[in-house]
Amino acid sequence: TPGVTTLEDVAWWMSDQQLTRGLGSSFDMPSVYITGPEGIVATSSDRIIQRGDLLMIDWGVGFLDFYTDMKRVGYVLREGEIEAPSALQHAFDQALAARDIMKATIKPARTAGDALEVMWDAMQAGGFNRAEFNQPSDDPLVTDVVVGPHSVGNWGHGLGPSLAFFNPTRMTYELRPGTLISIELFAFTSNPDWGGAKVRIPLEDDAVVTSRGVEWLYPVNRRILLIK
């Protein structure tokens, strides 16, 4: 309920739902956070959710010794709104376009690092800028992207090969067919409604590596979740 519910209320509710269903957790407390012109505002705290907030959820569940890692994006509608502002939708669409390239180009390789470079060649050819974590460029005409695909399965962040900046050693592992990975990215797109500050859109869902690219393990979400 806008104006009443806090971020930690949502996080605890999600945890309760996991326990009720007999599911484990990949990361203990889910991360429920708000993103604004200054970046991440608050995470799973007593911050009250307001209309116009852009919400992100990062969590994972466990079942039969299999663990997931996923993200979702939601927007709290203002009075009279029936959809997210066009600038936020554009930022989300840019993130989807970047993810589509990742999905098509991540394939088995001698090392995960080799697969990463092939993927980035395609991403940059598609007009996306390679950025450092949470350090987007000042160029309002480009969408900056940070990628973090990593293994999943035995845990939310698994023990296998990784294309993520935070697992440099695992970039040296062979990326084989059948490897389970999360397709994770953060896309930063300029938002005129925020004075040109860039919107941080995180996307993450789980997939299996094949010779055709990667295939989703389940139907993935392709829209901003609208909260009334």
Task: Give the predicted meaning of each segment.
Residues 1-228:
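Active-site neighborhoods and metal-handling regions in enzymes and metal-associated proteins
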